[in-house]
Amino acid sequence: MEQFSDLIKNRRSMRKFTDQELTQEEVVALLKAALMAPSSKRSNCWQFIVVDDKDMLEKLSHCKEMGAAFLADAAMAVVVMADPLASDVWIEDASIASIMIQLQAEDLGLGSCWIQVRGCPRVNTCIRCLIFRCSCRWFPL
């Protein structure tokens, strides 16, 4: 258990990133960690979109007025979405999945930072772009 204690003590939000791309193995590890997250009644109401397209990361960095600009410099983002009709605790379920991604990132030696955009007016436009854009990578797990 000492390793886990070290992991949670050492994890910090990072807002400065290198342009080094993640390997497919690293991305798969992050997504597997998210899929292992507990959810209410095992509803698994979340969905994950991996974004590594620089233009899309730039657009996403403007999805809220303040606090997301650093996303433009990241090599990749995982967009965590949840269906409010699938679970009455969808916010909590998505939050738990998000922290699982962050803990896995820390374990892999990767920096991460949570950006909360729920309720931001520009989010719907960004999400529509994500869903219909071909530049997102999907990994079968």
Regions found by a protein language model. Give the residues of each.
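Small-aliphatic-rich amphipathic alpha-helix that forms the alpha element of a beta-alpha
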Residues: 34-35, 78, 86-127
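Short, cationic motifs built from Arg/Lys/His that form the positively charged side of catalytic pockets
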Residues: 11-15, 57, 101
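Residues that form generic nucleotide/phosphate-binding pockets
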Residues: 7, 63, 126
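A glycine-rich helix N-cap at a beta->alpha junction
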Residues: 69-73, 77, 127-141
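Glycine/small-residue-rich phosphate/adenosyl-binding loop
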Residues: 25-32, 36-97
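Residue-level "edge-of-site" marker
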Residues: 47, 118, 140
